[in-house]
């Protein structure tokens, strides 16, 4: 799961991983159970990682109906079952009416910043995250 959080000005929220300083990303995560609907996963991960409730007035969650399959980085391989080497990432976005300060879980993320989407794409460590940010103008609800 990848959720790009942005404003109408196409400023994007990035959060820095606590376990990998310098690794900036959008909200990411996985289903809690096999049948969990993707939209529910996106909403839960946003709440867990930023404190933002997607149901707040003015917030717009959108499924891009786009997915990426990529090889799992070795540093995170231990989080997966033995033999699992690839992950399928479903892309969503969440438009906020304005840039807000997230409430980070310090076990997962240590810092946050808002950047224009092109600068944010350059800052992301994940190629699929950077690609999603570059697609933001096509998928954004303005």
Pin down the residues of each PLM region.
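Active-site-adjacent beta-strand/loop module that shapes the phosphate/pyrophosphate-binding cleft
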Residues: 65-101, 113
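C-terminal alpha-helix
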Residues: 135-142
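The catalytic Nudix box helix
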Residues: 26-64
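Active-site beta-strand termini and strand-to-loop segments that position acidic
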Residues: 5-8, 17, 94-96
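Conserved N-terminal beta-strand and adjoining loop/helix that marks the start
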Residues: 1-13, 34
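NUDIX/MutT-family hydrolases
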Residues: 89-133
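A conserved beta-turn-beta hairpin within the catalytic core of GNAT-like acetyltransferases
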Residues: 20-23
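Hydrophobic pocket/interface hotspot
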Residues: 15, 42, 46, 112
């Amino acid at each position: 799961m990848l959720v790009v959080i942005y404003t109408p000005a196409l400023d994007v929220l990035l959060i820095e991983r606590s376990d990998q300083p310098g690794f900036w990303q959008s909200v990411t995560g996985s289903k809690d159970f096999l049948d969990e609907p993707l939209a529910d996963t996106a909403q839960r991960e946003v709440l867990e990682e930023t404190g933002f409730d997607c149901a707040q007035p003015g917030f717009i969650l959108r499924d891009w109906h786009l997915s990426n399959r990529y090889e799992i980085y070795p540093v995170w391989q231990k989080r997966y079952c033995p033999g699992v080497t690839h992950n399928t990432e479903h892309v969503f976005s969440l438009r906020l009416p304005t840039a807000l300060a997230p409430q980070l879980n310090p076990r997962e993320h240590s810092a946050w910043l808002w950047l224009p989407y092109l600068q944010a794409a350059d800052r992301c460590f994940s190629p699929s995250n950077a690609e999603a940010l570059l697609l933001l103008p096509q998928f954004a609800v303005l």
